[in-house]
Amino acid sequence: MSVFLSTTREAAGLGDADAWFSTMTGPSAAEPAALPRARRLRGVSEHLEAAFDAIRDEWLAIARKTTGDPNQELAHMPTLSTYASDFGMMLAWRRLTAEVAKGREAVLVLCDDPWLFRALAALDGVTVPGRTPALWPRLLGAHGRGWLARAAAVGRVAWYWWAARRGRRDIAPGGKWILVYGHPESDAEGNDAYFGDLMRQVPGLRRLLHTDCGWSRARALAADGRTVSLHAFGDIRLLPALFLARWKPRPPAGNVGTAWLVRRAGVLEASGAAAAMTRWQISCQSRWLRRARPAVIAWPWENHPWERAFARAAKSVGTRCMGYQHSVVGRHMYNQGADTNLDGDASLPDVVLCNGRAYGRDLAAWGMPHERLVEAGAFRLRGASRMSFSPNGPILIALSNDPFLARQMTEAARPLAGTGRRFLVKEHPMCQFPFEESEGFTRTEQPFAAMPPLSRVIYCTGTSGLEAYLAGIPVLRFKPAGRVAMNVLPAEVDIVSVDAEGLAAALDRPPLLPAANRASLLSEPDPEFWRALFETGAPAALKDAS
């Protein structure tokens, strides 16, 4: 049959369509109340995730065509960053819509995003019975936000540079370093959120703070006498150029739909200050490397644009650079594949230190050279989990840090409370999400280790699902409507995924206890190994992770 493409505002009814679904990509990001929910196309969440699983190679091919575009090295879309860019989601919606257009049903597709709307309209079998949404309001808003965001960023950078500049005096060439973010759980007593107590274990190890760390936090951490802020090493003459720091992609020729989505990615990335801050980070780290010339440095590695530039600059001054796996790799963390480094291994760390063997295998499957992969242990998830299972315990809902996803989780679970089920709802530590408590649906602020025995854990994004899995607690991965929740579990971990429609049935089924083998996923960090790693930096001291 065909697809009828419309905006939410114009969708007064189904018309000639048999079913409908919404991309939920516009400013409202919500489904219309006017359309009958019984006629909503079923299984959209499942099919959308399947489409997202299938678009990686297409995204990579498009990213390769951006090489040479102005400021391409500052952008997230060319790195296939699924957290920092929603380009892959746009490709998935287009793929799903193309598949629906080949089916037997006539389907109404709602889309309020003007770029995605035009990309879908270019597909075979898609008809636009009404008006196409205007581009200019979104363009005007994006440009205005971009200028304001960059102006604010320049002001912050100027202040941080002035406040931190004295730190330059304490830098002597050589030595051992870690480069970290200003995490609230780090302190000036030798504990770091990313590297545990390594600063107490390795004599002479110093800490360098990323430019995302504000001055007050940097000053508190610098009280140890071994921590300095990268802001101190920036070139103040660069500040005017930060106003103009934005990726300007040239849409690829030959595919109208792809061209619209590339334009969209460029506009969205320019609507904030991410490119400006990446340029400042690259300036600071390059100047620091030329001055400090460290022997060895490690940092929480996620293969972001600034990290690729850092690896190139470190190698140019003879520094051995070690990327320590920060976020879990997972099947949707596309940017961590070595094939996304468009300059080959020049922008890869000399060594990638993995949390465990499973992560080494996943990275190897994405093209990371085996000889660079090292099993180093997990500082952030070390030790046996203190969560426990009870078939009669409450169900924990570990909310996502994305309010769009957290809202769907609470709306899906709340109607199921008070029917013999007890839900404990825990906010993400980095995102407060206000919600109304009710019978059997209560908030908890307890850490995982202090919670009562749980019968299940429902999660959407983050590592709470992995922690529960390792503790032997049945886990349900919530699949939201309108978006793919990034699956961050290793490829060998298979758990049940459910959407809002299937949640009740999944909870009615007897729980299946996971047969978790912690040793195959995560290993304990060995202090002797880490000391040798920083003392020698020699490949002979490393353990194969693949």
Residue ranges and their predicted role:
Residues 1-546:
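Catalytic-core helical/loop segments in enzymes performing group transfer/polymerization on anionic/lipid-linked
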